[in-house]
Amino acid sequence: MSYKLKLILLFLFLAGLFSCTHSEPQIKLQSGDLLFREKSSENISKAIDKVTQTFGATHFSHVGLVEVTDTGIVVLHANPEGGSCIVSLNEFLHPKGDSVTVIAYRLKEDWQKTIPAAIQKAHQMMGKPYNFSYILSDTAHYCSEFVYLAFADDSVFKLEPMTFKDPATGNFPATWVEYYQKMGIEIPEGKPGCNPNGLAASNKLERLGIIK
């Protein structure tokens, strides 16, 4: 074997070794895990992310609840297209055929016992329309409201006063002004609510990593 060939083989071996030791391990999802989608290119997605930043500096605009069934992994969530519904994991990871970054979080051990009841509550909310006003409601739900309510009986997550103001300017972005003008209601500034970035910042959760 020539010296040059030996160098090539050594390089390939070291490259493979480095890749194996530094790649993120495959995540095995469990029922009760939360999947957070990073913001998309849609205006509302960007607007949600912009006004809901936390100290964790996450950029999430959607969240869903994992359930592992006998036939596969599904995600229970509320979205504008289908309201409160159940979709396959693949459909959640590739909305409208696109690929988005999805980060998995898991409840810490002390809170794992709340999951069965939360899954049951989530199923009871199936079929309700999407809550486009983002004002808490019993008849319609937005994504983080859906997750909050699923765990509400065990007080896993908490509500915070909502803000729709740009933290850099203190003013309402044009996107939100136009959004609520079309709905014919005032911007619900200060009303209790929740958002994906706020849920992800909970000290009851631990980050698992990116779903491949």
Residue ranges, per PLM feature:
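Bacterial Sec-dependent N-terminal signal peptides
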Residues: 1-27
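Cysteine-nucleophile amide-bond enzymes
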Residues: 20-212
